[in-house]
């Protein structure tokens, strides 16, 4: 699988739902849901996007939105270490550019604008040292739901709904 056809992203949105996806559909750079604009914004940095877009939710988005609502936020933003859209993390190892040509800028912009940032990519975040690269890129406090036995921040689908946040120790990676 290659990414020879680089294309600029397009934003698909309405008042409460949105996504930024490359024109060819290979990459999703940003996904969000808003339910109360008077409340703060919670961002999640996950591994890679799957099927969710401006109009379709997936289990990860629903779980992240559930946490955000439970903790008093009015918007959830999802960005990823790798922007390659795939339901199979093994595809990240096979693609020549799983990060995506514009991903770092979206990561920085979303995390800079969020009131709190949760990292939650699981053990595959060690691929090409990407987790370390992104934590160095982000100039804000980072939180995690928990960490794996490889000291990577756990994915939201593998945590109970009543999980508490903890400050993520960047040095553990």
Task: Locate the predicted segments by residue.
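Acidic, metal-coordinating catalytic cores used for nucleic-acid/nucleotide bond scission
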Residues: 53, 83-85, 123-129
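Hydrophobic alpha-helical segments
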Residues: 1-3, 63, 71, 85, ...
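Short connector loops at secondary-structure junctions
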Residues: 74-90
């Amino acid at each position: 699988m290659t990414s020879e056809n680089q294309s600029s992203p397009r934003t698909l949105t309405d008042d409460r739902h949105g996504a930024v996806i490359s024109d060819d559909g290979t990459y999703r750079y940003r996904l969000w849901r808003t339910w109360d604009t008077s409340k703060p914004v919670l961002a999640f940095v996950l591994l890679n996007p799957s099927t969710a877009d401006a109009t379709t939710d997936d289990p990860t988005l629903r779980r992240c939105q559930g946490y955000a609502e439970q903790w008093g936020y009015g918007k959830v933003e999802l960005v990823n270490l790798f922007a390659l859209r795939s339901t199979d993390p093994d595809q990240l190892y096979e693609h020549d550019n799983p990060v995506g040509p514009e991903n770092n800028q979206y990561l920085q912009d979303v995390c800079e604008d969020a009131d709190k940032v949760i990292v939650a990519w699981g053990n595959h975040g060690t691929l090409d040292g990407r987790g370390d690269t992104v934590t160095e890129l982000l100039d804000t406090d980072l939180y995690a739901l928990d960490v794996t036995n490889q000291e990577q921040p756990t994915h939201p689908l593998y945590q109970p709904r009543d999980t508490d946040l903890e400050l993520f120790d960047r040095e553990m990676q």
